[in-house]
Amino acid sequence: MTNIITRFAPSPTGFLHIGSARTALFNYLFARHNNGKFFLRIEDTDKKRSTKEAVEAIFSGLKWLGLNWDGEVIFQSKRNSLYKEAALKLLKEGKAYYCFTRQEEIAKQRQQALKDKQHFIFNSEWRDKGPSTYPADIKPVIRLKVPREGSITIHDTLQGEIVIENSHIDDMILIRTDGTATYMLAVIVDDHDMGITHIIRGDDHLTNAARQIAIYHAFGYEVPNMTHIPLIHGADGTKLSKRHGALGVEAYKDMGYLPESLCNYLLRLGWSHGDDEIISMNQAIEWFNLASLGKSPSKLDFAKMNSINSHYLRMLDNDSLTSKTVEILKQNYKISEKEVSYIKQAMPSLIVRSETLRDLAQLAYIYLVDSPMIYSQDAKEVINNCDKDLIKQVIENLSKLEQFNKECVQNKFKEIAIYNGLKLNDIMKPVRALITGMTASPSVFEIAETLGKENILKRLKIIYYNNLNF
């Protein structure tokens, strides 16, 4: 079998989109499964829209996901001389031509076709003219001379055979008036020079496939195997947008998802291995094949994403979870070694209530005794409506405890409840709000044991401060 070579070729015009990350993943897995190569190419021919920041976002996103590429990164912006050389070769062979038609004239023809309700294909008057007719005052483009007769067949692994008549393919521009290559030319020259054997990309590129094959044929290049995968849709079945969660990979990292989890989730968006839901990267490399790709669009499902992420979180040991949680908290707060030890001790009770690292960090804030308390709106309402005399009893009773472990604290609260003819929850509700700033949290008794008497009493006494404006 020919050595498999795939590529991921994003345009650096923004963040690494979640759909693009899936495309990169599929190319990476197919190459690794076949002991092939996975290359990265930056398609930055659009100078106005391409940015260095976007390039860095692509690099960091791929590295974070663990999709490490082979060899040096290819930048199209550094290869324009090669594209011009290739276009001139086609000119010399009569497979391309100089076109001097102004854009205004083409726009006029397009408007007329629209008015006549006809499909517009630009037919250049310069297609068969020679140098003696060339105007001196107009800079030309170089166009591909697509054969008038015949058809082009797209052989797609997933979509099957698609036949496009040549009469429906325009003489596309290869070199612009400023001498720069178009995307259509650059991608063919690059794929050939890089030895790409398989192209795996979104089916939004299917409309370009026939035009690109026409360029392959003009050069006499072998056409790579093509697989056009359905795009990811939102939960409502419509095209994925920001309102659905069409964010960059960096955003998912910031939201507290693990890279292994996100790769697992993206893999299952359009590819399956029986009923397996949890698939490690090593298993994915071993099992991945194009035959198991789905033909229907997948829907972005955050509930499923969270479920998979929680599984991967629970696979981490206590030290790793603590380290990752503290790393997030340190973005906004100073964390002492004492507080790190509190979080580590509490981690077993935090992880069972968390689906993401952000969830963990939010709960772990309870243990930052040197930072100001943060109260949810619900917690503030509970505190405003609570019986302050009851809280005073709690403070007095807890102050007398010699042992401050969870059993002793729990027993003391039960005694207070019985003494006041209350249910335990009637007391714990305002106590939880004061100690954690939340109305739902890990066990207050476990929190009390971890933080100790002094910190717990300090938080309970805050109810007497007049400047809180609860």
Swiss-Prot record:
Its main location: cytoplasm. Keywords: Aminoacyl-tRNA synthetase, ATP-binding, Cytoplasm, Ligase, Nucleotide-binding, Protein biosynthesis. The keyword Phosphoprotein does not apply. Monomer. InterPro entries: aa-tRNA-synth_I_cd-bd, aa-tRNA-synth_I_codon-bd_sub2, aa_tRNA-synth_I_cd-bd_sf, Glu-tRNA-ligase_bac/mito, Glu/Gln-tRNA-synth, Glu/Gln-tRNA-synth_Ib_cat-dom, GluQ/Sye, GluRS_core. One of its GO terms (molecular function) is zinc ion binding. GO terms for cellular component: cytosol. One of its GO terms (biological process) is glutamyl-tRNA aminoacylation. It catalyses: tRNA(Glu) + L-glutamate + ATP = L-glutamyl-tRNA(Glu) + AMP + diphosphate. The keyword Protein biosynthesis applies. ATP binds at residue 242. A motif ('HIGH' region) lies at residues 10-20. Belongs to the class-I aminoacyl-tRNA synthetase family. Glutamate--tRNA ligase type 1 subfamily. HAMAP family: Glu_tRNA_synth_type1. Its EC number is 6.1.1.17. It is found in: Cytoplasm. Catalyzes the attachment of glutamate to tRNA(Glu) in a two-step reaction: glutamate is first activated by ATP to form Glu-AMP and then transferred to the acceptor end of tRNA(Glu). Gene3D superfamilies: 1.10.10.350, HUPs (3.40.50.620). This is Glutamate--tRNA ligase 2. A motif ('KMSKS' region) lies at residues 239-243.
